Curated annotation (Swiss-Prot):
Known function: Involved in the metabolic adaptation in response to environmental changes. Catalyzes the reversible formation of succinate and glyoxylate from isocitrate, a key step of the glyoxylate cycle, which operates as an anaplerotic route for replenishing the tricarboxylic acid cycle during growth on fatty acid substrates.
Pfam family for this entry, one: PEP_mutase
Enzyme Commission number, as recorded: 4.1.3.1
Magnesium recorded as keyword: yes
Highest taxon of the lineage: Archaea
Record text on subunit structure and interactions: Homotetramer or homotrimer.
UniProt protein name: Isocitrate lyase
Gene3D superfamilies membership: Phosphoenolpyruvate-binding domains (3.20.20.60)
Organism: Haloferax volcanii (strain ATCC 29605 / DSM 3757 / JCM 8879 / NBRC 14742 / NCIMB 2012 / VKM B-1768 / DS2) (Halobacterium volcanii)
Record field: compositional bias (Acidic residues): 328-345
């Protein structure tokens, strides 16, 4: 057979993106969908335990939390997809993932969308910065031309293997070295016409006026367009006289709201304080931590990791597993409480 007779789109697969359908349903029926930013599987599970709508794999959180790097596109597409896959497998929530600029040209963008879909991600966001990109709140960012950006988003939409997968287009025009407010708004219109599901206008500060103005201006021409809002961890929201509320943003049409580095800041602050106490007070640091996590939903790392389920699977297939569990010490369904030396034998 001649190679020209083969199906040339062998890298495309039929993907049934159930989580994307769930996300779309929430976007269409709720005032807004909120997802805290995070970077690892346990955070995704904790988001589900605490009642969130979705889990957001933040790019900055991933590169800092997993690699210790700044958000300067120093991590590859495959590394990002692998992290997203781990999060997808750890939760029943829809996972929304940072796809940066698509990691190169048109072919890279298309591959990135498909790899994220195969990993089980419900939505991806792609931005219009030049490559390598940087966090939207690190000085020095530039945007590609309108033509290149439009092609990038059209390629992303066309590459979808499931019609349900949500594509979010981010524009960094406002605050970039070669953009301005008018470009910010016009690019949102261009990207909407390119077929994306949601437009995310990255803002350089927590201005209420800018958020309101953007929604009003773009909805003059695209009244049904859904917007995304980054309630950014780079901003001091608590110091604003009248900070935007999630409900206000939802009413303006910002249907997807997220805090990019919430999980990282929450974790880093807690770990720093506890490590510091441990360094200064030795075992008292452990005692203090125990007083806070005992009888808390996060008390047992065994329960957080579903050890009982894995033990059940083990006993189903290994005839000796039940005997070993019953005759040895350690966590089991019969011994699930934290271990002390006073436990009865």
């Amino acid at each position: 057979m001649n190679p020209t007779e083969l199906d040339s789109d062998v890298f495309a697969q039929d993907v049934d993106n159930q989580k994307a359908r769930e996300l779309r349903e929430m976007l269409n029926t709720q005032d807004f969908v909120f997802a805290p930013g995070m970077y690892h599987a346990l955070d995704a599970r904790l988001a589900e335990m605490t009642g969130h709508d979705a889990a957001y794999m933040s790019g900055y959180s991933t590169v800092l939390g997993q690699f210790g790097f700044p958000d300067l596109e120093m991590v590859t597409m495959t590394e990002m997809v692998e992290n997203a896959k781990r999060m997808v497998e750890a939760t029943n929530l829809p996972v929304i993932a940072d796809c940066d600029t698509g990691y190169g040209g048109i072919h890279n963008v298309r591959r990135a969308v498909r790899e994220y879909e195969k990993a089980g991600v419900a939505a991806v966001h792609i931005e219009d910065q030049t490559t390598p990109k940087r966090c939207g709140h690190i000085a020095g960012k530039q945007i590609v031309s309108r033509e290149k950006a439009k092609a990038r988003f059209e390629a992303a939409v066309d590459a979808k293997q499931s019609e349900d997968t949500v594509v979010i287009a981010r524009t960094d025009a406002y605050g970039s070295s070669n953009g301005d407010w008018d470009e910010h708004v016009e690019r949102g219109r261009i990207y909407a016409d390119a077929g994306v599901d949601i437009v995310w206008p990255e803002m350089p500060n927590p201005s209420r006026e800018d958020a309101v103005a953007y929604a009003e201006e773009i909805h003059e021409t695209h009244p049904d367009l859904k917007l995304a809002f980054n309630y950014s961890s780079s901003f001091a929201w608590s110091e604003e006289e009248d900070p935007l509320t999630f409900q206000e943003l939802g009413d303006l049409g910002y249907k997807y709201i997220f805090i990019t580095l919430f999980g990282l800041h929450s974790g880093a602050h807690a770990v720093y304080e506890d490590f510091k106490k441990l360094a200064e007070q030795d075992e008292e640091g452990q005692f203090d931590l125990e007083q806070r996590y005992l009888d808390h939903p996060t008390e047992s790392h065994h329960e957080l990791s579903f050890v009982s389920r894995y033990q059940d699977i083990e006993t189903e297939f290994d005839p000796e597993a039940r005997r070993r569990i019953e005759e040895s010490e350690g966590f089991s369904e019969e011994q699930a409480d934290p271990i002390t030396s006073n436990d009865d034998d």
